[in-house]
A protein has these predicted regions:
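Outer-membrane beta-barrel "beta-signal"
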Residues: 424-438
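Transmembrane beta-strands of outer-membrane beta-barrel pores
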Residues: 68-74, 106, 114-120, 160-162, ...
């Protein structure tokens, strides 16, 4: 039509071109409006057709982490009457943990966590071995907690250790089984106190008197003091009362899955009386403290320490009342010359942050742990290969590649605290890790 108008002289060529341009712009504008209306309509339809999850599903939180590790050990041993041996061992290992927490009511929570490992209480590591065979998964946590008030929480089942403590006596992988109570109160704006109680099961014995099962009662009282805006001091005293240990009967001391077998292998000779009942006793005090300082250095720094003493350890009594039912000769204890071997201590520091991408963190401690200071079955499984009668250095560095991905390097440089009974055992260990949280 515009061309006809130009042919009849009613429109000039320039006027016709201008009119065509305006018409094209109007056409583009209308197309954009139609497209926008269609998009908005699609959004509204998506809102009305979106699947709404049940409220109980929204209360569930899932989490997990994967750790890939290269682990090298260098060991030098010289047992009494034998030649010195040296060897080193390389292993490629992993740890996988998958957890779920559900807020069942305003005051209650249920949690479950699965983990890799061999089933031992103080490790979740699993080696890549056995020509690619499948790996086992265990129940690492299964608990219910109730918080009836802000100052009180009660947890039952297999749960996280609530105690303020150190790896000198508790490996972080140990999740006690039983009931725990945690209380905390603010005395002033700068001073708070806390208490943790534990009633935890050690063994379930196949005997008629179920009240005699070995049990641990833990009592902890501590305080948190805000010395200044950037300085916090935390300390606690804990008593561990191991009950009914004399009901444990002599068994296969080579079975490291048992309480007596694990302890016996890891420097704690288990001694039995003429009725083949365990004589070893544990009634342990632990004192721990940590000082946290911020804003003095470019990164936070912490100083910490721990001391443990088993007041029930008595080498003379073990030698006097003990017999040798098969693989536990009390005469071997003569080499300790009456020393009860009942204490241990740790001091260290950490520096850095471990929260987000670009953060770095470093930690160092030195420790000494005598044979009978605390049950070997619960202490750090990596330091000196696990167990007691050790001393040495621990150092670790971390760098956060992403908020949820970190690279770690850990070193253990250890030896026997006392070589008089079991001989020399020096062990150095390097672990290189990549840890991914999800």
């Amino acid at each position: 039509m515009i061309n006809k108008l130009v042919e009849k002289g009613m429109l000039s060529v320039s006027e016709a071109q201008e009119l065509l341009t305006e018409m094209q712009k109007e056409n583009d504008r209308q197309k954009a409006e139609i497209k926008q209306v269609a998009v908005e309509a699609a959004k509204e339809e998506a809102k009305t057709t979106k699947v709404k999850l049940p409220k109980w599903v929204e209360r569930i939180k899932l989490s997990g982490d994967l750790r890939l590790r290269h682990d090298t050990q260098w060991r030098t041993e010289k047992k009494p009457g034998k030649d010195e041996e040296k060897y080193h061992r390389n292993r490629e290992r992993f740890r996988l943990r998958l957890g779920m927490r559900a807020k069942t009511t305003e005051t209650t929570e249920v949690g479950v966590r699965l983990a890799s490992g061999s089933g031992y209480q103080n490790t979740t590591n699993q080696s890549f071995d056995e020509h690619g065979r499948g790996k086992e998964i265990f129940i690492d946590k299964a608990y219910a907690s109730w918080q009836p008030a802000d100052f009180l929480e009660i947890t039952g089942g297999k749960h996280k250790n609530p105690l303020f403590t150190a790896p000198l006596v508790w490996d972080p992988d140990v999740n006690p089984e039983g009931v725990s109570e945690s209380l905390k109160f603010d005395i002033t704006d700068n001073v708070g106190i806390f208490a943790n109680l534990g009633q935890w099961f050690i063994e379930e014995l196949n005997v008629k008197d179920t009240n005699s099962d070995p049990t641990l009662l833990a009592y902890q009282l501590g305080s948190v003091i805000k010395v200044a805006d950037n300085i916090k001091f935390e300390f606690a005293a804990t008593y561990y009362d191991f009950l009914n240990m004399d009901t444990v009967e002599y068994g296969d001391l080579t079975d490291t899955a048992s309480f007596i077998g694990y302890n016996h292998k890891h420097s704690q000779q288990m001694i039995f009386d003429s009725d083949e009942k365990l004589l070893n006793e544990f009634g342990c005090w632990e004192l721990g403290a940590k000082l946290k300082i911020k804003d003095v250095l470019p990164v936070p720094i912490s100083l910490f320490g721990s001391y443990v003493k088993n007041q029930e350890a008595d080498i003379d009594e073990l030698m006097e009342k003990g017999v040798d039912p098969g693989d536990s000769d009390p005469a071997k204890l003569e080499k300790y010359s009456g020393d009860d071997r009942d204490s241990g201590w740790l001091v260290g520091l950490s520096v850095g942050n471990k929260k987000k991408k670009g953060n770095w963190y470093a930690k160092y401690h030195y420790q000494e742990l005598e044979d009978y200071a605390f049950p070997a079955v619960f202490v750090d499984s990596d330091f000196h290969g696990g167990g007691s009668n050790n001393k040495g250095h621990y150092v670790q560095g971390r760098y956060f590649i992403r908020d949820n991905i970190q690279a770690r390097a850990t070193g253990f440089f250890t030896k026997r605290e006392d070589e008089s009974k079991d001989g020399k055992k020096d062990e150095d260990r390097i672990q290189l890790d990549i840890v991914i949280a999800f």
